[in-house]
Amino acid sequence: MTDSPFLELWQSRAVSVREQLGLGDRPNDSYCYNSAKNSTVLQGVTFGGIPTVLLIDVSCFLFLILVFSIIRRRFWDYGRIALVSEADSEPRFQRLSSTSSSGQQDFENELGCCPWLTAIFRLHDDQILEWCGEDAIHYLSFQRHIIFLLVVVSFLSLCVILPVNLSGDLLDKDPYSFGRTTIANLQTDNDLLWLHTIFAVIYLFLTVGFMRHHTQSIKYKEENLVRRTLFITGLPRDARKETVESHFRDAYPTCEVVDVQLCYNVAKLIYLCKERKKTEKSLTYYTNLQVKTGQRTLINPKPCGQFCCCEVQGCEWEDAISYYTRMKDRLLERITEEERHVQDQPLGMAFVTFQEKSMATYILKDFNACKCQSLQCKGEPQPSSHSRELYTSKWTVTFAADPEDICWKNLSIQGLRWWLQWLGINFTLFLGLFFLTTPSIILSTMDKFNVTKPIHALNNPIISQFFPTLLLWSFSALLPSIVYYSTLLESHWTKSGENQIMMTKVYIFLIFMVLILPSLGLTSLDFFFRWLFDKTSSEASIRLECVFLPDQGAFFVNYVIASAFIGNGMELLRLPGLILYTFRMIMAKTAADRRNVKQNQAFQYEFGAMYAWMLCVFTVIMAYSITCPIIAPFGLIYILLKHMVDRHNLYFIYLPAKLEKGIHFAAVNQALAAPILCLFWLYFFSFLRLGMKAPATLFTFLVVLLTILVCLAHTCFGYFKHLSPLNYKTEEPASDKGSEAEAHMPPPFTPYVPRILNGLASERTALSPQQQQQQTYGAIHNISGTIPGQCLAQSATGSVAAAPQEA
């Protein structure tokens, strides 16, 4: 059969590209080894050093478990900080104070020396749902589906792909050679290479199927209040609550407004209220201690006064009750003064709650409708007598997010200020990570100074595989922390938006650092761009030859092993948190302050960062599951241990988070990138080893191209929705009548006010019973109105989109 002119042209072009890259008919493996003769990364050690690395990592894991067991029982309840956290800091503690506290004692006392270890297996999803929230259930369900997927992938990789690779005879017959287990062991004319591409397609469909089953199992419960509340930006800063209510009554007479809350800058007031609360707890602690002992306690409140062993001038001791009483009075004065200033700091935003969801939906559609007039398209909502005064044409209207999802202190940062801050942070982050993307650059720098030369002759797997993979894991844990904290500094309006952007940034960064650049033999983004665009570089001709080096897969197998044992062990120990916790306990000036530190040490679980970390390792596993099938069972071990550690941490360590469903669906989309990268890896292998004209290369290329086209069509144009794994269920309230009755009932507290300020409002109401009947969500004559630091926490993208419009 005569080849078509198109294929001949394509082949000639492919040959020229391969020649430009310095690739011959067959890669020169010895050259790759010789080019790194002074390096500690690529060495032909026994079976890639995997047995030695596995033994060391398992030993380290057992040691970390032992250390954590000791610390958990001896050091300030470090292993159960969520259980001893402040009882009224989160709604779950209020809800479970009478039912779950005894259950916690059962876990601590009934199970022997390591109750936390067996508690991981005894915990039921109902307990986790009640204690940790539905987001934790969705997260753990996602992990379970990944576990079942990897069980199937491991079975197919070990029972089908591995024997096929071992049947080749291209590499050494040594049974201790790791390269015999990889795809590099097959001859270029072996028809079994087709099997790898077919199984890669099967893995793609398996991933879509498992993810679709996961999203179908999600029953997302929408809060009644959130579904009836709209968030409005673009209000004049001098707008009044009564004017906004009148506008909706006149423009939408069929829609009944239940409440309107204007937004104010209450960041400082929130801080003062938290400090006052800590002071009151310390005062109560020493008051109760005096009642119990009959003696007044002396403290040294000066900086580092707890280290003073004797009383000298400037380091005098004073009565604890008198000190905290004085601090409480001072904070109350500052709070009262700040309350007066709050009314002068409106944010131009408001929450509007309606009687029914249909009313809120109708108004939202009216504001977002696009009415085209000639060549100009603009939306004009229904007018009222206050439309001109309120500039309704400039409003941006969206559904409100859950009040627990709002980052209250960030609401005052909006518009141009928010964008400038975002650009500055991310530009600085990019510059910093441009040259320090991977730990490989550290190894290269060490090699330049001949640091590794004395141990080069040892050819020890501990040196050549354990330390590089441990270093890779260490940097993959450290450097994303920089991305994590940079996201916190961006001042997002919602925790959901913060977590989703954090997940995307950390995931992309980790994939480059852990998978793409090490696979290409590159050391940082600097070298990546030089290799990509600098055609005259002498380094460009040697990079791609080392992509599918026989022992290259061993490096990633060892990385997965390190993540499974050392990574999960360190995540259980949480060494940075332990260091911070220890430092805060040492620096606490009094016993009451140490009690406050213990009760305020727990933080919300960062689903964004945890999703990104787990999906990075999952992507590495899937990307090499065909070319290096040995990685699959170790990946399964990683996910199993990760699931156990996360169950423990969610229940005992972290506070619950209330996020939007978008964070969980974004994780599903990122999981689909793993089998697609596996197809890319097979295509690169076929292109480099077989050539573009090879049937297996053409078939793999067509599959990759078709997959990309389907993804683009679904993402950009909404096609192939039946193929999408995103198919979740929304639970409706049991009774609409109950919802209507609930809408007319006065809530126990103002929903769109920070919890700490809401408690202050309750105190004022208790002190002034005559005002209780007059209290409304947006009133500015009481604390809930003076501090309505309410600002809708939009969805991840919505909050960012609305922010610049407030400039």
UniProtKB/Swiss-Prot annotation:
It holds the Pfam family RSN1_7TM. Its main location: membrane. Residues 75-134, 218-416, 491-495, 587-606, 652-661, 710-807 are cytoplasmic. The modification Phosphoserine is found at residue 739. The chain crosses the membrane at residues 52-74, 135-167, 192-217, 417-444, 463-490, 496-532, 555-586, 607-624, 629-651, 662-689, 695-709. InterPro entries: Csc1-like, CSC1/OSCA1-like_7TM, CSC1/OSCA1-like_cyt, Csc1/OSCA1-like_N, Nucleotide-bd_a/b_plait_sf, RBD_domain_sf. This is Mechanosensitive cation channel TMEM63A. Residues 555-586 are annotated as: Gating helix. One of its GO terms (biological process) is surfactant secretion. Monomer. Keywords: Calcium, Cell membrane, Endosome, Glycoprotein, Ion channel, Ion transport, Lysosome, Membrane, Phosphoprotein, Transmembrane, Transmembrane helix, Transport. Residues 219-414 are annotated as: Intracellular linker IL2. It comes from Pongo abelii. Glycans are attached at residues 38, 450. One of its GO terms (cellular component) is plasma membrane. It is found in: Lysosome membrane; Early endosome membrane; Cell membrane. The keyword Nucleotide-binding does not apply. Mechanosensitive cation channel with low conductance and high activation threshold. In contrast to TMEM63B, does not show phospholipid scramblase activity. Acts as a regulator of lysosomal morphology by mediating lysosomal mechanosensitivity. Important for the baby's first breath and respiration throughout life. Upon lung inflation conducts cation currents in alveolar type 1 and 2 cells triggering lamellar body exocytosis and surfactant secretion into airspace. Also acts as an osmosensitive cation channel preferentially activated by hypotonic stress.
